[in-house]
Amino acid sequence: MTKTFIFGHKNPDTDAISSALIMADFEQQTGNTEAKAYRLGEISAETQFALDHFNVEAPELLNEDLKGQDVILVDHNEFQQSADTISNATIKHVIDHHRISNFETAGPLYYRAEPVGCSATILYKMYKERGFEIKPEIAGLMISAIISDSLLFKSPTCTKEDVDAAQALKDIANVDLEAYGLEMLKAGASTTDKSAETLVNMDAKSFNMGDYVTRIAQVNTVDIDEVLDRKEEFEKVMLEMSANEKYDLFVLVVTDIINSDSKILVVGAEKDKVGEAFKVQLDDGMAFLSGVVSRKKQVVPQITEVLTQ
């Protein structure tokens, strides 16, 4: 049987890592014994907390050339967010909950995208549809991914399906959703021991928006001001990366996971467009965005709209 590489996006978050592991288990249950989960970056503190809690080993870092290899993408589809050699791979499946952009294949494939808050929610539905066993550790990974992507069900991306899935899984995983979720999110919200470069790259994605390449990074915290006390450090890293990677715009979204608000820091020639997108005036490259927590639903569409007019 041909080996199948399963992975989420670069700079993986908890959903990207968890969904790769879950999908590998799903494929194993279909009889694909050569399916294996990989990762495209370092494990975050939040994700490591989840892996440790449910005694799951992190996926191996993908270093292989994917030319001619069978792959399954989870939690992403855009090629600039995927493995460097993805254009040479044979994409067999995609399981995702994001927009579809910069994606094409030479042949047909199984593509499942749903407007839910988390890829793991789709995978939960797939297990139920096939009558597959959901082991406690798989249930735990599903819950962790849902809580992470929905910020403990507070994000506007969160749907009833996400909540229902987590509720159905909590007894299998033997966790209290509120207590476990808050502990996991706080584990990932510590920033004082991380460099500016690490924080800017920890959860960052690139997007093609019309004629512009935009980089949007997000940092979760319990104290926005503490993070942005290091504004000059962040700006230096963001400007250097923009020059090296040819980003037209770089946006750092610092999100308060307790109060569900964010502040943004923006660099780039088109930064005034970001103020226009949110109908705010940038002050020294920064602005407060009340109620904004979701990059996918509350940041990317708004900036895309002003950059493609």
From Swiss-Prot:
Major localization class: cytoplasm
GO annotation, cellular component aspect: cytoplasm
Binding site for Mn(2+) 2: 15, 75, 97, 149
Chain positions recorded as Mn(2+) 1 binding sites: 9, 13, 75
Pfam family, one: DHHA2
HAMAP family: PPase_C
Name of the protein this chain belongs to: Probable manganese-dependent inorganic pyrophosphatase
Taxonomic placement: Bacteria, Bacillati, Bacillota, Bacilli, Bacillales
